[in-house]
Amino acid sequence: MNLPEHGGNLIELSKKAGCNPKEILDFSANINPLGFPEWLRPFLHSKIEDLISYPDPNYTSLKKKIHSKYGICTEQIVLGNGASELILQIPFVVQADYALIAVPCYSGYKEAISLLKIPCIEVTLKEEKQFRLDINELRDVLKSKPDQKALVFLGHPNNPTGVTLDKIEVLKIVQEFQNSVFVIDESFIHFCTNESSFLKDKTENMILIQSMTKILALPGLRIGICYASPLICSNISKRLPTWNVNSIAASVYEKAISDEDYIENSKQNIKIWKEKLIYDLSNLEFLNLFSSEANFILIKILDNKNIFDLTQELLIKYKIAVRNCENFSGLSKNFIRIAVRTPEENKKIIDAFSNIFYGTRQRLKSRKKTPSIMFQGTASNVGKSILTAALCRILSQDGIKVAPFKSQNMALNSFVTLNGEEIGRAQALQAQAAKILPDIRMNPILLKPSNEKDSQVIINGKPLNSMNFKDYDQYKPIAFEEVKKSYDSLASEYNVIIIEGAGSASEVNLKKNDIVNMKMAEYAKADVLLVGNIDHGGLFGSLLGTMETLTEWERKLVFGFIINRFRGAKELLKTGINYIEEYTNKPILGIVPYIKNLKLPEEDSLEFKSGALDDTSKLEERLDVVLIDIPRISNHTDIDALRAEPDVRVRIVRTVEDLGEPDVLILPGSKNVISDLNHLYDVGLVNKIFALSRNQKTDIVGICGGYQMLGKNIFDPYRIESDQGSIQGISLLQIETILEKNKSLKRVFATHIPTKTEVEGYEIHHGKTKSIGNTRVILLNEKAEELGHSDPTGRIWGTYIHGIFDKDEFRRKYLDQIRIRKGKSPLVKVQVSYNLEKSLDRLARYVRQSLNINLIYRKLGLG
């Protein structure tokens, strides 16, 4: 039986396991489980142009950096293609009479010694002493050969035991036997929390070896360093080929020297993870663990199970690789070594051990995460919300209990649940797609911009307060805890969760306190689908660019890509698809076409502000409906149902010049009524609206904030919206509004008195409005509370009800009144059903046909 000399050979391991190398969970190689530094990928890209030149054979820049950092003279530094290359040269340079090693130890020492064919004496580290070196045993050997030069190899910490040396005792023996040369291998020293390197105490007869391979998690890059006397370094260098270290490796090492935070963070995380791993392993009575100061643990199997059979079962059945230590001199045949990995990975090996030895899988204390898929985007407005709704509807159609989730939503279009709690409008639509009721747990944090700097923060459906970016950024850790609670609670009740990210996944300036994109995906253990909107242009560049800003752990979460809103022949995308799949090793999971007349409300104001929703076609025989755009518009989706009508054209107007004489003018809701009313005064629209009220042709409608603007005065005694305190309204309705501290949030069912039809919607406002003159009550809820007023003519009216036009019967009766006033025949019958169910089914049909649903289902464990 030939055992590998080293761990980490994934190619060989995967052959034995019959799987892809990426499927192997490798505990056999002692590599930093945090992965390489976040700066590595972009840094490598910046250095690619250096590959057209040979490296500096003296590695001057790197050696100067080492000298600046550690005070080591450049003549005392040799760089190697990994620490192993340097170790192999040492016996030839030292020319000792014999070698002395403490076993068990790294097999590379013996390999190097054997090349020179000098005698090798082994001092056995005793199991009963936890494999800690007894320095006197070394001393006895050295004393027994006073006229001979010894080459002593010692690991600090030692591999595979993880035990460090007693620095004081070692320095004594180094001084005592100055004719001998002591090699201190510190390849794992960076993992020791109580690091006590020999670097500052190095003597003339000492050679210090360090490796950046392990701590940087870059075993494929190869970089090692030797610190020794100028003579030894010179002689080692002469044995090495010119340019033995490539320029990329040298540049990475030079960069890493300055990144103390990465190394310290690695130490602290590994310390915590190792303690938990040791605790869990200690609860398995068939294992005996040995104390380790490194990032790996030596384990003795107390059961009679054959070690080879055990390692093979772990590999083949569980795809877990561990280091079989049978070929370590100084160890019996029942030892293995495992690396410390992430908590999730460590739990897998605990479960595997438990299952192998007990015959039953140990039950986890924490519940397994509910399967989830997350849509993230290359930018805002790429279709994340709609695709989330589509997948919710597809899963629901297939009988799977599914719910949507978005940890944090910044939008002006909110929705009020039946319990009077506020969430993003998009999550309400997604809930409908999933055929469930909207729930605040689907959107625990809602941010509603109130001015250029501040947003109202709504936590679990209730307003908290207004915060600027800095204040909210500091609050985010607390907010994320609320997010986790909501997610866990929601996920416990459903079979699948479909998560929506926010904005772009590539916002490197926002990643530190991210709670809505990759950090959320990591918490939920969600596979990420990255969405790009081909309508934006530069699709493949945006997909590739986004991937390049992601750290390695973030990239691993990305399952594949979706091309959205495509128009044209798919064959035109073939070259780009091949390029992106080859470059990223991630699949394109579908090409979703541009779907015309989808008739679903937009999530936020991006599409609205872009002008894409502005109908500038010829009016012909249609009614001309104008929505006044204001800087802090909210719930502009109130007009979506009107936009669907065949006899209506909806225009978005921002200036007096574009207004004209519409049949209906709508003042929308506002997140800051006083500020937006000031804006209307400033651009001259107030005077124009007042003039239209006199033409006997135009209906003027105010919804929520727009309703308040139509009145005589708006009072803000608590300075909720500004320091102005009050503002005069447009004075088209004899009403006054006082902005109260508490926000009114509730679903509404009411009767429109003039048409005697039922309407429904929701209230979201701070205001309390009352009539102060000649007005008519036009809307009453089931409690006979007044929810809207008009002037005596009925042409000027307002209401607090968002979604008032969504009911088909009311919308048609209202539009027919306008038609009759214009001398047109009423259409009487409902022309279009503003039925989101039909639209959602249509959306699901397109998306099901466009995506690789079978592959997505398999990822969710549903295939």
From Swiss-Prot:
One Pfam family it belongs to: GATase_3
Annotated spans, Putative threonine-phosphate decarboxylase: 1-373
Binding site for O-phospho-L-threonine: H6, G7, N30, N159, R323, R337
Chemical reaction(s) catalysed: O-phospho-L-threonine + H(+) = (R)-1-aminopropan-2-yl phosphate + CO2
InterPro entries noted in UniProt: Aminotransferase_I/II_large (IPR004839), Class_I_gatase-like (IPR029062), CobQ/CobB/MinD/ParA_Nub-bd_dom (IPR002586), CobQ_GATase1 (IPR033949), CobQ_N (IPR047045), CobQ_synth (IPR004459), GATase_3 (IPR011698), NHTrfase_class1_PyrdxlP-BS (IPR004838)
Keywords: Cobalamin biosynthesis, Glutamine amidotransferase, Lyase, Multifunctional enzyme, Pyridoxal phosphate
Coiled coil location: none
Annotated spans, Cobyric acid synthase: 374-863
Domain GATase cobBQ-type: from-to ranges: 622-810
Family: In the N-terminal section; belongs to the class-II pyridoxal-phosphate-dependent aminotransferase family. In the C-terminal section; belongs to the CobB/CobQ family. CobQ subfamily.
N6-(pyridoxal phosphate)lysine modification, residue list: K214
Name recorded for this polypeptide: Adenosylcobalamin biosynthesis bifunctional protein CobDQ
Biological role: Catalyzes two activities which are involved in the adenosylcobalamin biosynthesis: decarboxylates L-threonine-O-3-phosphate to yield (R)-1-amino-2-propanol O-2-phosphate, the precursor for the linkage between the nucleotide loop and the corrin ring in cobalamin, and catalyzes amidations at positions B, D, E, and G on adenosylcobyrinic A,C-diamide. NH(2) groups are provided by glutamine, and one molecule of ATP is hydrogenolyzed for each amidation.
